[in-house]
């Protein structure tokens, strides 16, 4: 028997999905019968920053809030109820790219998106080092290019992630990434479900005299479907919905 959507929303028996695409941020509410109950969205565009394609992180937050508010308005119009929590929340976004932070969580360089292909030298060097193809857009190519170019911030990198990984961290406080997204940062070992250990060793030996960090300490922890990726924090709820209506409830992210 089909679940009443209004009752499911009121009981938080729903899943909220938010996807950060290149031109649109999309929000969708799914009910217990896997039916789309409501949608929302926000349009945005990347811009050139120092010759590289980027989005500002304040635009990420503003777009998240706008897309969510749009979804809530759709829920109210359809069902005359306001959602206050969800059973689960999923975040997805553009793969690859470069979001690097220092030990105090300060952004070290403007977000470099998947569109940037200024990493030819790094990608070639890593492909030969590993004997495994490293595409221009992968996060490790962007990181190594920053090292090769002796960018001022490169020695201070403490955390590297993707757009979805950054949003997830803001919502939960956890530096983790799903295995699909992580596979666009650094090669994954299909038998262990995490980064290829021998490649980590090779890379750390390559740059040990250039930077003080170890790559394995910088990359996010890789998680597979069904593993605990954290729960929505009060700060995360306020980030999504500054009106204060959204509560943490039991939402896993």
Positions of PLM-derived features:
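Glycine-rich phosphate-binding/catalytic subdomain of phosphoryl-transfer
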Residues: 70-250
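Repeat-blade elements of multi-bladed beta-propeller folds
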Residues: 10-13
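N-terminal phosphate-binding loop and adjacent alpha-helix
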Residues: 40-81, 128-131
